[in-house]
Amino acid sequence: MLLALAQWLQNDYSFLRVVNYLTFRAVMANLTALLIGLAFGPWVIRKLTELKVGQAVRTIGPQTHLVKAGTPTMGGVLVLVSIAVSTLLWCDWGNRFIWVVMLVTFGYGAIGWVDDYRKVVYRDPRGMSSREKFFWQTLIGLVAAVYLAFSVSESSNVRVWELFLNWVEGGLSLDMPYKSNLIVPFFKEISYPLGVAGFIVLTYLVIVGSSNAVNLTDGLDGLVIMPVVLVGGGLGVFAYVMGNSVYSKYLLFPHIPGAGELLIFCSALAGAGLAFLWFNAHPAQVFMGDVGALALGGALGTVAVIVRQEIVLFVMGGIFVVETLSVMAQVTWFKITKRRYGEGRRLFRMAPLHHHFELGGWKETQVTVRFWIITMLLVLIGLSTLKLR
């Protein structure tokens, strides 16, 4: 919005030309989201407390968590509003990738909101049924995946529609351009053609998987938001590179017109996340809830797909991956041993993994900060793939 206004007035006020610079708008988006979050955070927490939107805590978890019962949840609304206002103020409204990411982010946020609402109203920690939640995640994820399958390599929505029709008329068979290939980190000449179906399936898995992985990680004060900020910042760098024809050519990446604008979204995400951390740091004044975790995870997955860095997301978001795998391994091993021995056995003291360390004697703050440090290292490894190829 401000970009269009600045372009309209820049002939009379030359200093407004600075708004044309992507890096300037990214910095301003970050600061705007940060200030909105810090300014309205106390009010949001107070309102959530008045509405008795308190977190229900499972009694089977670490006993130290019982004191958290009643802490306001659904604080992710503050994060999403900060991101939305900041992004819409500083982005180019004509950029289609911005709207795709916003669709996924707020679509998944709506799913999380319903889930949190049911937990609060019915005092049931389970919230929405897994089947219902998965259905809506799948619907939104597939819509985004189908659109991105044809839009990543094309700059015109008209051309995207033509490619889609050609794909349908051709019996769901269509040659995809190089830009749609799966990029393998550290190898500049290795990429794998996915085809339309492969692209859609991979995109769906990345978006839905990332959303649920972030949600599973959100279990301790401040644990998930800092890794989200770090990974989002890393993806913002990739967005800037992929959207710049000079840098992408120099670094031997495919140029994706319009991808650079996602730097605005990632910057706003980082600013909103840091503002939320101000109130979510131990002892937390507010919890994110599914409304924030599902949305932010979906956002990271969508950005990663657009900038063709699905594998790098897997690396940078290693904490999310390990937390998810710990749950899968715990459930699988429990079922196998129950079938074999008549009683289920556990691989970990408790899943997700952060609870395993808590029950092993680590303080909550130790788990959180150590996971942050690991994420910092993983993000640096991910960023190193820009040049080490």
Swiss-Prot record:
GO biological process: cell division; cell wall organization; peptidoglycan biosynthetic process; regulation of cell shape
Similarity field: Belongs to the glycosyltransferase 4 family. MraY subfamily.
Transmembrane spans: 25-45, 74-94, 97-117, 134-154, 190-210, 222-242, 259-279, 286-306, 311-331, 366-386
Top-level lineage group: Bacteria
Record's subcellular location: Cell inner membrane
Membrane topology: Multi-pass membrane protein
Co-factor(s): Mg(2+)
Underlying gene: mraY
Full protein name: Phospho-N-acetylmuramoyl-pentapeptide-transferase
PANTHER family cross-referenced by the UniProt entry: PHOSPHO-N-ACETYLMURAMOYL-PENTAPEPTIDE-TRANSFERASE (PTHR22926), PHOSPHO-N-ACETYLMURAMOYL-PENTAPEPTIDE-TRANSFERASE HOMOLOG (PTHR22926:SF5)
GO molecular function: metal ion binding; phospho-N-acetylmuramoyl-pentapeptide-transferase activity; UDP-N-acetylmuramoyl-L-alanyl-D-glutamyl-meso-2,6-diaminopimelyl-D-alanyl-D-alanine:undecaprenyl-phosphate transferase activity
Pathway(s) served: Cell wall biogenesis; peptidoglycan biosynthesis
One Pfam match: MraY_sig1
Keyword entries, A-Z: Cell cycle, Cell division, Cell inner membrane, Cell membrane, Cell shape, Cell wall biogenesis/degradation, Magnesium, Membrane, Metal-binding, Peptidoglycan synthesis, Transferase, Transmembrane, Transmembrane helix
Enzyme class: transferase
InterPro entries: Glycosyl_transferase_4 (IPR000715), PNAcMuramoyl-5peptid_Trfase (IPR003524), PNAcMuramoyl-5peptid_Trfase_CS (IPR018480)
